[in-house]
Amino acid sequence: MAETNSREEELLRRIQELELENEVLKKKVAEVEYDAKYPKIDENFCLDEYKRYGRQMIVPEFGSLKSQIKLKNSSILVVGAGGLGCPALLYLSAAGIGKIGIVDDDIVDISNLHRQVLHTTDSIGMFKCDSAKKYICKLNPHVIVKTYPVRLHNDNAFDIVNDYDIVLDCTDTPAIRYLINDVSVLCRKTIVSGSGLKSDGQLSILNFNNEGPCYRCFYPKPPSAESITTCSDGGVIGPCIGLLGVSMAVETIKVLTGFYTKDNFKPFLSMYTGYPQQSFRVFKMRGRSDKCSVCGSFPTVSKEAILNNEIDYVAFCGKVDSNVLTPEDRITVQQFSDIVTRQSKAPVLLDVRTKEQFQIAKLPNSINIEWDPTFKKLESLDKYLPEDFDKDTDPVFVVCRYGNDSQLATRKMKQELDFKNAKDIIGGLNKWSDIVNPKFPKY
């Protein structure tokens, strides 16, 4: 009797086990049927991301969930976290790019904040790449951000660029622009390139799918160093440069989601102007140049040449040497201050900044004639001088913002206008603010 009861208990236990196994199998079958009906494109795509990116996924041109997955599985390298890089980074991280690299060795300064929208007042003194990462991680925790607080150069460019799918050139230096182009072409990376100054800018897609034209195809030789104006010298309207950065983000999304194909992509150059009326013009560009030194039929630019520093990008692009005067032709801001204090008659002071800068802040009794490399404007200086002014003996002091243009102007005045006693003020008005009058505004 006891043996019979034991056998029945064993059968009941086994039946319960089989019923449990059956329920597990039913659940697995249901999951398989569900997955067959609603396939998982990416098991790492969570419900939060559906909500986060839903408004862009429903746009027909975007490409729905598959395009969103492409963005998540993509990586971009942004070189320069400034006026172009910040808005591009802002929108691309919000759009769901999976991995973002940021290269910038510059430090956040208060003068950056009107246009470099990832940085805040609290970021002043931080590396720009680290400041940008801090903002991005708060905006979208699904994005992986890697920072490179270094200057891109021959030795590190290949190692950095190789880790990413696409490169955004958000720099403002010709030498770096050529380096980015050459390394990206040799690494078979597409480049989204932008530039901007004052209220104007332009953008293009280079080396698309490793078949489109590159930067050297359009510009085999760099512009003269004298013709290059930086944001600090020429100025920039924040929203204008920001619009270019946002446009770069749009083009990047098009490339990464496959909107552009080998068949439909045509090389282009988009040009934007903010004043007097905003306008965007798009120009068709030619294809690859067979004579291009990096992507042509007989290239002379190679990975080995770059790594061995056989290509000097700074020398290739040139630079303006502002140190053109002897020590005898220059005085310090303190020396000029002593002259002003000591003399009853105000010295002749020529300010060679633009009229816009002159209106911001100026020293008393200064004459404003903008420095012009052609030297035409300075020829009118005579009419501003006292009638008894003697070019052979009387001093005329020349000042600018940083002490660069004033050197060039002083040299021209001595060599071509016969001002024998022209003197450059070392360090310009910025140094005046540092040493003589801290209340004199810097801008």
Curated annotation (Swiss-Prot):
Matching InterPro entries: MOCS3/Uba4, Rhodanese-like_dom, Rhodanese-like_dom_sf, ThiF/MoeB/HesA, ThiF_NAD_FAD-bd, Ubiquitin-activating_enz
Residues reported in the UniProt entry to bind ATP: G83, D104, S111, N112, L113, H114, R115, K128, D172, T173
Active-site residue list: C231 (glycyl thioester intermediate), C400 (cysteine persulfide intermediate)
Main subcellular location: cytoplasm
UniProt record, GO biological process: protein urmylation; tRNA wobble position uridine thiolation
Cofactor binding, note field: Binds 1 zinc ion per subunit.
Catalytic class of the enzyme: transferase
Molecular function terms, GO-annotated: adenylyltransferase activity; ATP binding; metal ion binding; thiosulfate-cyanide sulfurtransferase activity; URM1 activating enzyme activity
CDD domains: ThiF_MoeB_HesA_family
UniProt domain Rhodanese: residue ranges: 343-441
Pfam families: Rhodanese, ThiF
Pathway of action: tRNA modification; 5-methoxycarbonylmethyl-2-thiouridine-tRNA biosynthesis
Cofactor(s) needed for function: Zn(2+)
Swiss-Prot/TrEMBL keywords: ATP-binding, Cytoplasm, Metal-binding, Multifunctional enzyme, Nucleotide-binding, Nucleotidyltransferase, Transferase, tRNA processing, Ubl conjugation pathway, Zinc
SUPFAM superfamilies linked: Activating enzymes of the ubiquitin-like proteins
Record bears the keyword Transferase: yes
HAMAP family to which the protein is assigned, alphabetical: MOCS3_Uba4
Function: Plays a central role in 2-thiolation of mcm(5)S(2)U at tRNA wobble positions of cytosolic tRNA(Lys), tRNA(Glu) and tRNA(Gln). Acts by mediating the C-terminal thiocarboxylation of sulfur carrier URM1. Its N-terminus first activates URM1 as acyl-adenylate (-COAMP), then the persulfide sulfur on the catalytic cysteine is transferred to URM1 to form thiocarboxylation (-COSH) of its C-terminus. The reaction probably involves hydrogen sulfide that is generated from the persulfide intermediate and that acts as a nucleophile towards URM1. Subsequently, a transient disulfide bond is formed.
Family: In the N-terminal section; belongs to the HesA/MoeB/ThiF family. UBA4 subfamily.
Name used for this protein in its record: Adenylyltransferase and sulfurtransferase UBA4
Gene assigned in the entry: UBA4
